[in-house]
């Protein structure tokens, strides 16, 4: 068997998330259908393993997955074959043969998530599936200052949703930026870390928006973090504004044939 790593994008609007769920349309489901089609429907069916799960409505610009094929195929040919079999809301960007022990999830080094927020009193119908809406004015400098308290290794118990299956809530965040995109009239949050908990990014965004609006003091992150109390963080930003931008690996070591 030959193992392949793919990088792909998807519009999460019409998916019930990444992971296969009975009776639901998911990203993993349509990927496995395409992979098994080009592999001539082997038995048992081939499985696709993603770098992580995204929830319903969450998008990806650079999600990563791996799977095995019973034959060797050049990367560009695999990209064409998969895209010919996938629905229009999924696009494979790159395919590479990798070492047989490569794992998209367990070998991931960092992930970058982006959250886009649009303002205004009412929701823009053309952005409603691709941004979060926050109708109150916000101070980007306040949010950028407060966001730096998320950087480092912390126990993020206050910023994880119920239903998390993680055995530890300790994670490391290496970078957080908050900028105003004047051209698109959006505020854009970027988070880079070694992994994120269930709804963690969306909870942190909602928290920072309250700081930006003056409903919380700028130094409130550490107070709530130390309390380890989810109720103190309050809201969760909508799924529609969240994007998995990229997943990084110590990759030339994992690559076989580029």
Swiss-Prot record:
Q: Name one GO biological process term.
A: tRNA pseudouridine synthesis
The keyword Oxidoreductase appears for this protein: no
Amino-acid positions noted as binding substrate in the UniProt annotation, renumbered to this chain: 113
What EC number(s) is this enzyme filed under? 5.4.99.12
Which residues does UniProt mark as catalytic?
Answer: 55
Q: Per the record, what are the reactions this protein catalyses?
A: uridine(38/39/40) in tRNA = pseudouridine(38/39/40) in tRNA
UniProt keyword annotation of rRNA-binding present = no
> Which GO-annotated molecular functions does the record name?
RNA binding; tRNA pseudouridine(38-40) synthase activity
Against InterPro entries, the record matches this protein to: PsdUridine_synth_cat_dom_sf, PsdUridine_synth_TruA, PsdUridine_synth_TruA_a/b_dom, PsdUridine_synth_TruA_C, TruA/RsuA/RluB/E/F_N
Gene3D superfamilies named in the record? Pseudouridine synthase I, catalytic domain, C-terminal subdomain, Pseudouridine synthase I, catalytic domain, N-terminal subdomain
Family the entry assigns:
Belongs to the tRNA pseudouridine synthase TruA family.
| Purpose of the protein | Formation of pseudouridine at positions 38, 39 and 40 in the anticodon stem and loop of transfer RNAs.
Assembly description: Homodimer.
Return the protein name.
Answer: tRNA pseudouridine synthase A
Which classification does the entry list for the species? Answer: Bacteria, Bacillati, Bacillota, Bacilli, Lactobacillales
Q: Which gene encodes it?
A: truA
């Amino acid at each position: 068997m030959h193992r392949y790593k793919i990088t792909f994008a998807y519009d999460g609007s019409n998916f019930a998330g990444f992971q296969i769920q009975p009776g639901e349309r998911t990203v993993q489901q349509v990927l496995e259908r395409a992979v098994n089609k080009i592999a001539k429907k082997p038995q048992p069916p081939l499985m696709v393993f993603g770098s992580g799960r995204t929830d319903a409505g969450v998008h990806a610009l650079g999600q990563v997955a791996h799977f095995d094929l019973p034959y060797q195929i050049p990367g560009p040919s695999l990209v064409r074959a998969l895209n010919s079999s996938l629905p229009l809301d999924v696009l494979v960007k790159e395919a590479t043969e990798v070492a047989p022990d490569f794992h998209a999830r367990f070998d991931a080094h960092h992930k970058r998530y982006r959250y886009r927020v649009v303002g205004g009193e009412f929701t823009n119908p053309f952005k409603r599936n691709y941004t979060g809406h926050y109708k109150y004015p916000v101070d980007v400098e306040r949010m950028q200052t407060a966001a730096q308290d998320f950087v480092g290794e912390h126990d993020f118990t206050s910023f994880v949703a119920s239903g998390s299956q993680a055995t530890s809530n300790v994670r490391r965040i290496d970078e957080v930026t908050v900028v105003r995109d004047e051209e698109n009239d959006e505020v854009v949050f970027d988070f880079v870390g070694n992994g994120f908990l269930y709804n963690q990014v969306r909870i942190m965004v909602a928290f920072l928006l309250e700081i930006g609006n003056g409903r919380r003091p700028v130094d409130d992150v550490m107070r709530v973090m130390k309390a380890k109390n989810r109720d103190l963080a309050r809201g969760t930003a909508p799924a529609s504004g969240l994007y998995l931008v990229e997943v990084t690996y110590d990759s030339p070591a994992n690559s076989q044939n580029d």
